[in-house]
Amino acid sequence: MNIRNEIKAHIVQEGTTMSEVVRTLAVVHGWSASVPNLSDKLKRGTLRYSEAIELADVLGYDIIWRKRGK
């Protein structure tokens, strides 16, 4: 699964929409309130790590680095 589909799956899993997520990102983290901006970043694969952390935050997730087993 690519990052675009993974993020969209989490949005759906949380019972929300891209519009609602973008609105919350705009209020909480000062993002542009434009759904096409987020959608384009996901399509192009240009979402920054800091943006991914903020996106996870508004969806109620933490990004955790875990060492793989050998």
Report residues per predicted region:
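DNA major-groove recognition helix of helix-turn-helix/homeodomain DNA-binding modules
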Residues: 49-64
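Recognition helix of helix-turn-helix/homeodomain-like DNA-binding domains
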Residues: 28-46
